C-alpha cells in the first residue's frame, strides 16, 4: 500500500478511500495498459475513445518527445509527416479559412465568442478546442455542437486505419493523443465543408501541433500569464515569444492589453515575421458608438475576451469580403504601447447577439439547484484564479440572502501538472470558505467504464498524493492566517501594566476545515447531502462520515439554508463535476 493511500486511510478514513479497496491498484494498472486497437470501422464510440486513450502513453511517442525536446522544430515536422500519412497536405488546410487563437487565459472563451458571432451570419463553423469537459467529441464542433458519437466514431477509425496502413520503417509510430485529435479535426472540417474553422492552440504556439497552419485568415492572442513553465519558459516574456509563434507573414493579428514586457516581445515577433499586429481597444470604446453589449459569459475578465473576439470576427468578415459590416473609424497608433490600435466599429446585430448567446461550459458558469449553488470555473493560473475570485465574490454579493438563513461556503479544488497550487490556494483563501474539499480529477474511483474521463498518464496514487499536498498547503495557509490574527490585536500582558510585553489573545480555531476524497462523486455526495435535486445517487458509500469533520459537517450541510460551492483549479475537475451534475452533457 502506497504512502498516499495509507495516509488517506489512517487520517481521513473516508469511505471514498476505504471503498476503493483492492480496486485502486487494479484500476491504476488497467489505466496504464494498452487497449487492443480494433481494426474494423463501425466500432462503438467508447471503443474508439479507448483506442484513442492508448495514445496518451504511446511508448514510441514518449521516446520521440525525448529526442525532439532539444529540437522543437522537429515536432512541427513530425506533425506535417502525420498529416501527409493521413492523406492531407499543409496547403489543404488553407481551405478552412482558419482563425488561430492562442493565449494563457481566455483563449477558449475568445474562440467561443468568435465562433458564435460568425455562426450568426449563417456561416457553417468548425471549432477545435481543448480540453473537453465530459466527452472528447466536444473538442470538435460543427455549428457550435459537438460532433455526434457516430460521426466521431466514423472519422476516428478512418483516420486511425489510414495512419496504420501507411506506416513504414521510418514512420512506425502513431501520433500522440492531442496530435491525433488535431489531425482528426482538420479531416472533419474539410469533409463537412465548413466555411471557417476556429482553432484554439493546445500549448504555447510556436511549436504547438496546430501551428502547421500556414495561411490563417487572422490570428489572436488573449491575455498572457505563467503556465506550462516546463515547456514554455518561466517568465511571461519567454511565454510571449512562444505565443507569438503563430503569427504569419501578412496575416493580421490582434491582442489585448498585456504587461509591457510580454507586449514588447509580441511586437518584436510580429515585426520579425512580417505580421501586422493590432492592439484591441477596450469593449467600452465599441459601446461608445452603439448600445451597451451584453455577454453570455459572466465575469469582468470576459470583456477583454469579447473585445478580441469582435476584432477577430470583424477582420475575418472583412478579409472574406462580407458585406454586412459597419464602416470603420480610422485606426490610430497607441503611443503608450507602440502598436496601432485596432479599428473602432459599430458592432452589428449579428455580433451583439453572438456575444449575448455565447455558452461555454465550465467557465464562470453557475448552476442553481435547490439550496445548492455551484460556481464552476476552470481557472488554473494565478491570473485566471484572481479573475475567478473576483467573479465569485461579485456573484455572492448579488445573491445575498435577506431572510437571515444560514449559509455554508465550500471550495472544491484540484490542480495538476507543474502548476503552483500553493500560490493558487493563497489567492482563494480570502473567500473565507467554511470547508475546503480536495479530490483528483476522477469521476468514479471504482469504475473505468467511461473512456472519455480516463487519463492514462498518471496513477491514482500520484493524484491522491497531490491532493494531500493541496490540503497541506491549505492548512498551512489557515494556520499562518490564524497566527497573524493572534498578534494583530494584542492586549496588555496579564503580569500588569508595568510589563513591556504584549500578550496575544487566546488562540481561535481556524475557520476552514479541510477534507480529501478519492473521487469527485464522493466529494459531491458529501457536499450535497442528497439535497441536489438532480445529483441523487441510489446509495451512499459506507463510512462516508467516519471522519469527525465529515460527520459534523454533514449535519451543518443538511440544515443550511444555502450552500455555495466554488469548483476551480482545473478544467478537468470542472468537467467531472459537470458530468455528474448535468447528465445531458453525457448524451
From Swiss-Prot:
Annotated positions of the Phosphoserine modification: 539
GO molecular function, one term: ATP binding
Control of this protein's activity: Inhibited by ammonium sulfate. Inhibited by pentaglutamate derivative of DDATHF, but isoform 2 is inhibited to a greater extent at lower concentrations of the compound that is isoform 5. Isoform 5 is virtually unaffected by H(4)PteGlu(5) and 5,10-CH(2)-H(4)PteGlu(5) at concentrations that substantially inhibits the activity of isoform 2. Isoform 2 and 5 are equally sensitive to polyglutamates of 10-CHO-H(4)-PteGlu.
Effect of pH on activity: Optimum pH is 8.2-9.5 using 500 uM folic acid (PteGlu) and 25 uM dl-5-formyltetrahydrofolate (dl-5-CHO-H(4)PteGlu) as substrates.
Temperature dependence: Optimum temperature is 37 degrees Celsius. Activity completely lost within a few hours at 4 degrees Celsius in the absence of ATP and glycerol.
Tissues where this protein is expressed: With non-specific probe, highest content in kidney and liver and lowest in spleen, lung and small intestine, and readily detectable in all of the tumors except hepatoma. Isoform 1 and isoform 2 expressed in leukemic cells and isoform 4 and isoform 5 in liver cells. Isoform 1 and isoform 2 exclusively expressed in hepatoma and Lewis lung carcinoma. Isoform 1 and isoform 2 also expressed in bone marrow, small intestine and spleen. Kidney expresses isoform 1, isoform 2, isoform 4 and isoform 5.
Recorded metabolic or biological pathway in which this protein acts: Cofactor biosynthesis; tetrahydrofolylpolyglutamate biosynthesis
Domain of life the protein comes from: Eukaryota
Residues reported to bind Mg(2+) 2: 228
Residues that, per the record, bind Mg(2+) 1: 130, 200
Sections of the chain in a coiled coil: none
Catalytic activity: (6S)-5,6,7,8-tetrahydrofolyl-(gamma-L-Glu)(n) + L-glutamate + ATP = (6S)-5,6,7,8-tetrahydrofolyl-(gamma-L-Glu)(n+1) + ADP + phosphate + H(+)
UniProt-annotated binding residues for ATP: 106-109, 363, 377
Enzyme class: ligase
Keyword Nucleotide-binding: yes
Transit peptide: 1-42
Its job: Catalyzes conversion of folates to polyglutamate derivatives allowing concentration of folate compounds in the cell and the intracellular retention of these cofactors, which are important substrates for most of the folate-dependent enzymes that are involved in one-carbon transfer reactions involved in purine, pyrimidine and amino acid synthesis. Dihydrofolate, tetrahydrofolate, 5,10-methylenetetrahydrofolate, 10-formyltetrahydrofolate and 5-formyltetrahydrofolate are the best substrates. Folic acid and 5-methyltetrahydrofolate can also act as substrates.
Descriptive protein name: Folylpolyglutamate synthase, mitochondrial
Lineage of the organism: Eukaryota, Metazoa, Chordata, Craniata, Vertebrata
Gene name of the encoded protein: Fpgs
Amino acid at each position: 500500500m502506497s504512502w498516499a493511500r495509507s495516509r488517506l486511510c489512517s487520517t481521513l478514513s473516508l469511505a471514498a478511500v476505504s471503498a476503493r479497496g483492492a480496486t485502486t491498484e487494479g484500476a491504476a494498472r488497467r489505466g496504464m495498459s494498452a487497449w487492443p486497437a480494433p481494426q474494423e470501422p463501425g466500432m462503438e464510440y467508447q471503443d474508439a475513445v479507448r483506442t484513442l486513450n492508448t495514445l496518451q502513453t504511446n511508448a514510441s511517442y514518449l521516446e520521440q518527445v525525448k529526442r525532439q525536446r532539444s529540437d522543437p522544430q522537429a515536432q512541427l515536422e513530425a506533425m506535417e509527416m502525420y498529416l501527409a500519412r493521413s492523406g492531407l497536405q499543409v496547403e489543404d488546410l488553407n481551405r478552412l479559412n482558419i482563425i488561430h487563437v492562442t493565449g494563457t487565459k481566455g483563449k477558449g472563451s475568445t474562440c467561443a465568442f468568435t465562433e458564435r458571432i460568425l455562426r450568426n451570419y449563417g456561416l457553417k463553423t468548425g471549432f477545435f478546442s481543448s480540453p473537453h469537459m465530459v466527452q472528447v467529441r466536444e473538442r470538435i464542433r460543427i455549428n457550435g455542437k459537438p460532433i455526434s458519437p457516430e460521426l466521431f466514431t466514423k472519422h476516428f477509425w478512418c483516420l486511425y486505419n489510414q495512419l496504420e496502413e501507411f506506416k513504414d520503417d521510418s514512420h512506425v509510430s502513431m501520433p500522440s493523443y492531442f496530435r491525433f485529435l488535431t489531425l482528426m479535426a482538420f479531416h472533419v472540417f474539410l469533409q463537412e465543408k465548413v466555411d471557417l474553422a476556429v482553432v484554439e492552440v493546445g500549448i504555447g504556439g510556436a511549436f504547438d501541433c496546430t501551428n502547421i497552419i500556414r495561411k490563417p485568415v487572422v490570428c489572436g492572442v488573449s491575455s498572457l500569464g505563467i503556465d506550462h513553465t516546463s515547456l514554455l519558459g518561466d517568465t511571461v516574456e519567454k511565454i510571449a515569444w512562444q505565443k507569438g509563434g503563430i503569427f504569419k507573414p501578412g496575416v493580421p493579428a490582434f491582442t489585448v492589453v498585456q504587461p509591457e514586457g510580454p507586449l514588447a516581445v509580441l511586437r518584436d515577433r510580429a515585426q520579425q515575421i512580417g505580421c501586422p499586429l493590432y492592439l484591441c481597444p477596450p469593449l467600452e470604446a465599441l459601446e461608445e458608438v452603439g448600445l451597451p453589449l451584453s455577454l453570455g459569459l459572466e465575469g469582468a475578465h470576459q470583456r477583454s475576451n469579447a473585445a478580441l473576439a469582435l476584432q477577430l470576427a470583424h477582420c475575418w468578415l472583412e478579409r472574406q469580403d462580407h458585406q454586412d459590416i459597419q464602416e470603420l473609424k480610422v485606426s490610430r497608433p497607441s503611443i503608450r504601447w507602440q502598436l496601432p490600435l485596432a479599428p473602432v466599429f459599430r458592432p452589428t446585430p449579428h455580433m451583439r447577439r453572438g456575444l449575448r448567446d455565447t455558452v461555454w461550459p465550465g467557465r464562470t458558469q453557475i448552476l442553481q439547484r435547490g439550496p445548492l449553488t455551484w460556481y464552476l470555473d476552470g481557472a488554473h493560473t494565478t491570473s485566471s484564479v484572481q479573475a475567478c475570485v473576483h467573479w465569485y465574490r461579485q456573484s455572492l454579493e448579488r445573491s445575498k440572502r435577506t431572510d437571515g438563513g444560514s449559509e455554508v461556503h465550500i471550495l472544491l479544488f484540484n490542480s495538476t501538472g507543474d502548476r503552483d497550487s500553493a500560490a493558487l490556494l493563497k489567492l482563494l483563501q480570502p473567500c473565507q470558505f467554511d470547508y475546503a474539499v480536495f479530490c483528483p480529477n476522477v469521476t468514479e474511483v471504482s469504475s473505468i467504464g467511461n473512456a472519455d474521463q480516463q487519463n492514462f498518464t498518471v496513477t491514482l496514487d500520484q493524484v491522491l498524493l497531490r491532493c494531500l499536498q493541496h490540503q497541506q498547503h491549505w492548512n498551512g495557509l489557515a494556520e499562518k492566517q490564524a497566527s497573524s490574527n493572534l498578534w494583530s490585536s494584542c492586549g496588555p500582558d496579564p503580569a500588569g501594566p508595568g510589563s513591556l510585553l504584549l500578550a496575544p489573545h487566546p488562540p481561535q480555531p481556524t475557520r476552514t476545515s479541510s477534507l480529501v476524497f478519492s473521487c469527485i462523486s464522493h466529494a459531491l455526495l458529501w457536499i450535497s447531502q442528497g439535497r441536489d435535486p438532480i445529483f441523487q445517487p441510489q446509495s451512499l458509500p459506507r463510512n462516508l462520515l467516519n471522519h469527525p469533520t465529515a460527520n459534523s459537517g454533514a449535519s451543518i450541510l443538511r440544515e443550511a439554508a444555502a450552500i455555495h460551492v466554488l469548483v476551480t483549479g482545473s478544467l478537468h475537475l470542472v468537467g467531472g463535476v459537470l458530468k455528474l451534475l448535468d447528465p445531458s452533457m453525457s448524451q
